[in-house]
From Swiss-Prot:
Family: Belongs to the AAE transporter (TC 2.A.81) family. YbjL subfamily.
Origin species: Vibrio campbellii (strain ATCC BAA-1116)
A single Gene Ontology CC term: plasma membrane
UniProt-listed InterPro entries: AAE_transporter, RCK_C, RCK_C_sf, Transp_YbjL_put, YidE_YbjL
Protein name: Putative transport protein VIBHAR_02636
């Protein structure tokens, strides 16, 4: 049986989409040293080549892709978006605005000076900043009529310019950002590792990049005379066993009666005590504990140790430092802190925000007691609240259709901004009401990534027909301008952060990468800093930058 592959793909558009996706995703995994192309650029290049070979698809049919992508970006940003001004929040906002304003300004003036075709500049800026939301915002402005297409062009040609500009500039933006992270500290005679250690010393951090996470274990001992001498008649609160060793006494059996002790309890000879703590904490126990006989008793040791993810919700907790939680009072152990899907260093001085996820372990009732105080335990259900997901999606589209009039000027926000706002609202409500709008993180990631890939396939197949013609005509100009737009804003942001805001270098570099939404460069900075301290800065700017980049794409295409 003979199979005409070309005819098969031409007659089966769904098959064509997934063939392009499969090839593009495989292509995106290619590495050049430590540099990986990534899914977005792999799928875009593949779809451009397939488009050049004559395969086509109605790009408008795949606009659902960018809608889902930008909606999911809003949901992820929602829990932390309104808390962006806590502590260093104003610094992160200033850095994000520095990158945004300088990039838009440079792109606008340079593209007009160079006479670039309509759409090329927005695509170039999206690639130079490795910021797909710029591309999404620009296309939505075209779809909604916010941007006016020149008379000598049509929508397909503008879409072609967007995708070609993005494809040519993306690698320039990625490579230049990585080189910035490597070279600028050396040129400024700074050591990111030293800067990270400085923050660690100031805030009482450990080396979270090398930290291992264990569940607490339980050991039981019979109180002997040596331990009684050591306690010297002090109660448990005065002894401060947790502060000294990291263990706490969960149960006491006295005269055959089991009890949960409070801080006023005083140990007596013959008591049997169950201690909970990490293995290394048990090793730090005073020898007086171990001099008594270790007890192996089911009733005494029968404690249910759990590990839960607690989402910060309480207004009384948001805005406070991690150290203010005083976990020792609850007998709980903190394993990690996650914000905006980025694991944060174990910073006792970090200011908590709504939506932060604390991974906590300990005895079940104690962990649940802590959760009731600060928020709620994250739902481990695999079921998504599709009703809320779809309802807010509809609200976002409806909001984007609302037309506002100022004098003789009328405009609508468009789907991108409308869906961003509805997504942020859903994410914020989810952080405050655990039973509402729940979407498993894995499902959210899949919808977001698949939506972005559909978007890339659509614009690539539509624009691929004249890609090599564009490369020969404006390739050098686009690459040169992309280098300028990629480098100058981050240098300006560095100068503002270092000399005006006087930020720590490790935090500053993480914040700049977050403002550039360049996740691949984050690994480079963490490697150079030998720590995850820069993630504090990255998480501070990433959420706000995603929103601003979408608006930047809309603004730039309108001004072009």
């Amino acid at each position: 049986m003979n199979i005409d592959v070309v005819h098969l793909l031409e007659q089966n558009p769904i098959l064509l989409i997934f063939v392009v996706l499969a090839i593009g995703l495989a292509f995106g995994k290619i590495r050049f040293g430590k540099l990986q192309l990534g899914n977005s650029i792999g799928v875009l290049i593949t779809s451009l080549v397939m488009g050049h070979l004559g395969f086509s698809f109605n790009a408008e049919a795949l606009t659902i892709g960018f809608m889902l992508f930008i909606y999911c970006v809003g949901i992820e940003a929602g829990p932390n978006f309104f808390g962006i001004f806590f502590r260093d929040g104003k610094h992160y906002f200033i850095l994000s605005m520095t990158v945004l304003v300088s990039a838009v300004g440079l792109t606008y003036f340079c593209s007009h000076y160079m006479g670039l075709d309509f759409g090329l500049s927005a695509g170039m800026m999206a690639g130079a900043l490795t910021a797909t939301p710029v591309l999404v915002g620009a296309q939505d402005a075209l779809n909604s009529g916010l941007a006016t297409i020149p008379r000598n062009m049509d929508f397909s040609l503008v879409l072609e310019n967007l995708s070609v500009g993005y494809a040519m500039a993306y690698l320039v933006g990625l490579i230049s950002m990585i080189m910035f992270a490597k070279l600028l500290p050396k040129l400024q005679k700074q050591n990111l590792s030293d800067s990270a250690q400085q923050i660690a010393q100031e805030r009482g951090l450990g080396n979270s990049s090398q930290r291992k996470v264990y569940l607490p274990i339980i050991r039981a001992y019979r109180v002997g005379p040596e331990l009684i001498d050591w306690t010297d008649g002090k109660n448990l609160r005065e002894l401060g066993i947790y502060r000294q060793t990291g263990c706490y006494i969960e149960r006491i059996r006295r005269n055959g009666i089991l009890a949960h002790p409070d801080g006023d309890a005083i140990l007596q000879e013959g008591d049997e005590i169950a201690l909970v703590g990490f293995p290394d904490s048990h090793a730090r126990l005073d020898p007086s504990f171990r001099n008594g006989k270790e007890v192996f008793d089911r009733n005494l040791l029968d404690l249910r140790i759990v590990e839960e993810e607690i989402v910060v919700k309480s207004d009384a907790i948001a805005g406070k430092r991690l150290s203010d939680l005083n976990l020792s009072e609850f007998g709980c152990f903190l394993n990690r802190v996650v914000r905006a899907q980025i694991e944060m260093p174990m910073d006792l001085d970090i200011v908590l925000a709504k939506g932060d996820v604390l991974q906590v372990s300990g005895e079940k009732s104690r962990v649940h007691g802590l959760a009731e105080k600060i928020g709620f335990i994250s739902i481990h259900s695999q079921m998504a609240d599709l009703l809320a997901f779809c309802s807010f999606f509809i609200l976002g589209i409806m909001f984007g259709l609302v037309t506002m009039t100022f004098g003789q000027v009328s405009f609508s926000l468009g789907n991108a901004v409308g869906l961003l706002l509805s997504g942020i609202t859903l994410g914020f409500l989810r952080a405050n009401h655990p039973t509402f709008g729940y979407v498993p993180q894995g499902a959210l990631n899949m919808v977001k990534d698949l939506g972005l890939m559909f978007f890339m396939v659509g614009i690539g197949l539509s624009a691929g027909g004249k890609i090599f013609e564009h490369l020969s005509q404006v390739g050098p100009q686009i690459i040169g301008l992309a280098f300028i737009v990629s480098v100058v804003p981050v240098v300006l942001a560095y100068l503002v952060g270092a000399y005006v805001l006087k930020m720590n270098s490790a935090l500053l570099f993480g914040a700049i990468i977050g403002a550039r939404t360049c996740a691949p460069a984050m690994d480079v900075v963490n490697e150079y800093a030998k720590s995850t301290i820069p993630a504090l800065g990255y998480a501070g700017t990433y959420a706000i930058a995603n929103i601003l980049m979408t608006l930047a794409g809309t603004i730039l295409i309108i001004l072009s």
